[in-house]
Amino acid sequence: MAVAPAGGQHAPALEALLGAGALRLLDSSQIVIISTAPDVGAPQLPAAPPTGPRDSDVLLFATPQAPRPAPSAPRPALGRPPVKRRLDLETDHQYLAGSSGPFRGRGRHPGKGVKSPGEKSRYETSLNLTTKRFLELLSRSADGVVDLNWAAEVLKVQKRRIYDITNVLEGIQLIAKKSKNHIQWLGSHTMVGIGKRLEGLTQDLQQLQESEQQLDHLMHICTTQLQLLSEDSDTQRLAYVTCQDLRSIADPAEQMVIVIKAPPETQLQAVDSSETFQISLKSKQGPIDVFLCPEESADGISPGKTSCQETSSGEDRTADSGPAGPPPSPPSTSPALDPSQSLLGLEQEAVLPRMGHLRVPMEEDQLSPLVAADSLLEHVKEDFSGLLPGEFISLSPPHEALDYHFGLEEGEGIRDLFDCDFGDLTPLDF
């Protein structure tokens, strides 16, 4: 008889039963013990002896087991890993207690994209937007020092979000910690808030461009109107200025009028000191002519300045039928000229009747356009020689004296170049 070693720890007990003669076995019989894993806490009970002998060659014995307690809860299936949950970093605690329904499959939850009205969007709570708002707070600080507690209250975010930003800025040496909750900006203040300043400058530049375009349009209109005025045949006959017209603007008793006829691109420089007033003229295009406008005489007046009352007074100014001679001078009792009256804005009807009585030849082919200003004064002197008792006094020396520019000493002025007596003239008061 042999005992199989499959019994393990029950083999000594079986040998004791066989030695006591409790079991009647033949010599060729085999005993096989089938048992499960041992339970430490369960008591071991001896097997009941058989009631009678059996003729089977193999005897089977079962190891008694203690009753197991019922499981408290079903265990989850081991074939699928546990579900990973996304953390809500905006709350004070990490996990929220709440019941969740059974998760079936990998389909999208129907209520996942629906947000409550008071819930912030993902962009509003992003670190990118929080960093921009934090830099705006730094730009408002005069010395660049910001309290982190105050910044968290203003931005309405958690302090750990502010700490994340300050740790990065401190790592790239843009800020430095002054104390536990105070930091100071180390970078350039011009870079903080540069986006808004750039936007404001762009708007200012656009407004300046619009203003420039408007001014260019107005200048173009004025240039066009002036060109049309100069090309009009009706206005060409009145395109001149006399000495009396200039005197009507300035007070002859207080001011001295000097007329300057210069070519284009003439440079004028005026030096105003406490005692003297100096004017410097320089031109590379041609000579510069300077004239002195004398005081207006009592019997001389410009035909364009004839008073309307004098025209409508009813006096007979019909000339003789003989050859045209020099017209008589206007009476000395003519009314004074109005300084506020425009020089060139005269009515044509008020001038032409006056010109008809003078019997002065006024052919249009003899008139020069406005642009030909060199010969305009000569035409005026020839046509109105009887009405101009005093002409412009030329202050320019003869053109053959080319060295007059270098013939003045430091104490000499423009009056030293001419043989005119300027003692009776009153200096200009500016």
Swiss-Prot record:
CDD domains: E2F_DD
A Pfam family that the UniProt record links to this protein: E2F_TDP
Motif (DEF box): 153-189
Region (Dimerization): 190-279
Region annotated Disordered, chain positions: 95-123, 294-340
N6-acetyllysine PTM positions: K112, K115, K120
Keywords of the record: Acetylation, Activator, Apoptosis, Cell cycle, DNA-binding, Methylation, Nucleus, Phosphoprotein, Transcription, Transcription regulation, Ubl conjugation
Subcellular localization, as worded in the UniProt entry: Nucleus
Start-end of DNA-binding region: 105-189
Annotated spans, Transactivation: 361-430
Family: Belongs to the E2F/DP family.
Protein name: Transcription factor E2F1
Organism of derivation: Mus musculus (Mouse)
Organism classification: Eukaryota, Metazoa, Chordata, Craniata, Vertebrata
Gene designation: E2f1
